[in-house]
């Protein structure tokens, strides 16, 4: 960095420390990833200076010719990537994308079905602390107590009973394949609209490693980071018949000017995801996650639902007498970054939790393969087996540092 150290040494120091944290720790938060230098360059471009309210060819400001080119490329690439008729690349986040869809098909007080946050859903799917649970009437569905997989019979029963206007499929802490076709059958029976939130699995969907809801559902939303390896942002996919209402719900409905530098970075990420190498990347993400789950099972830990079909693993640490917060904080001390997470039918409050959520996208981007992930999994188990012994913590931290030195982060920095 050339100018920041002098202009704002405090911010510069914090950014350098963050570089060091990412370099010296194993990033295993399932919703995080590392963007390429090309994405980072687009993100830090002079497009951050440009206001471009409206849409390509229909702006409220002059001087938007280049912004139009950028947004049009992002739209076309998103449509190609997911096989969609329509794409809106302006949402600032996945939460904004979800809210735009709600505004497009629901009125205040209308009921909708969404996955229970405590069972792996997302707070924007009807949590009482979120606007989705305050303006509308959410009806939560969950997982089966024995299999810990989505209970489609319960969804059908709730749909018949409540006749919701919208059914939301998608999760933030669910490791199994989602059967979108079953959701479609249920929605058709009760006359409900369908929204799929594929924020976590969009990379798997775009490469064919998870069934796609595009063309089957009325609306599909996603973030552009996580498995897509783009900047933090949102995306809406739908059919052309919904273009007018969705565009108006994003702008001027819930947003003003789009973040054009972010949209430029989204366009770059979409182009990267259209390349053959990206499909190979997702293949390794999945192999790494399966390896991680297998290590945990072999070491006597309980993996929620018994394994994984995607990029994440939900681990029940209560079997070792730990809470999620104890496990996550302890792992952080030895250089492994995860997050505490509730597990289905958790007896602990969310702020404490009984589980941790681990993901493989970031480490796969960094270059780790299944053999490396086996080592990582064993290091995690070594720590959790004896989290309070200083000698054990020191040994595990040394193992983590061996891996981070083997896979440096230079390729993800601009300087």
Curated annotation (Swiss-Prot):
Chief site of localization: cytoplasm
Lyase is among the record's keywords: no
PROSITE patterns: SHMT
SUPFAM superfamilies, alphabetized: PLP-dependent transferases (SSF53383)
Binding residues annotated for (6S)-5,6,7,8-tetrahydrofolate, in chain numbering: 117, 121-123
Cofactor: pyridoxal 5'-phosphate
GO MF assignments: glycine hydroxymethyltransferase activity; pyridoxal phosphate binding
N6-(pyridoxal phosphate)lysine PTM positions: 226
Keywords assigned: Amino-acid biosynthesis, Cytoplasm, One-carbon metabolism, Pyridoxal phosphate, Transferase
Cellular location(s): Cytoplasm
Catalysed reactions, as listed in the record: (6R)-5,10-methylene-5,6,7,8-tetrahydrofolate + glycine + H2O = (6S)-5,6,7,8-tetrahydrofolate + L-serine
Top enzyme class: transferase
GO BP terms: glycine biosynthetic process from serine; tetrahydrofolate interconversion
Enzyme Commission number, as recorded: 2.1.2.1
HAMAP family given in the database record: SHMT
Function of the molecule: Catalyzes the reversible interconversion of serine and glycine with tetrahydrofolate (THF) serving as the one-carbon carrier. This reaction serves as the major source of one-carbon groups required for the biosynthesis of purines, thymidylate, methionine, and other important biomolecules. Also exhibits THF-independent aldolase activity toward beta-hydroxyamino acids, producing glycine and aldehydes, via a retro-aldol mechanism.
Descriptive protein name: Serine hydroxymethyltransferase
Organism of derivation: Leptospira borgpetersenii serovar Hardjo-bovis (strain JB197)
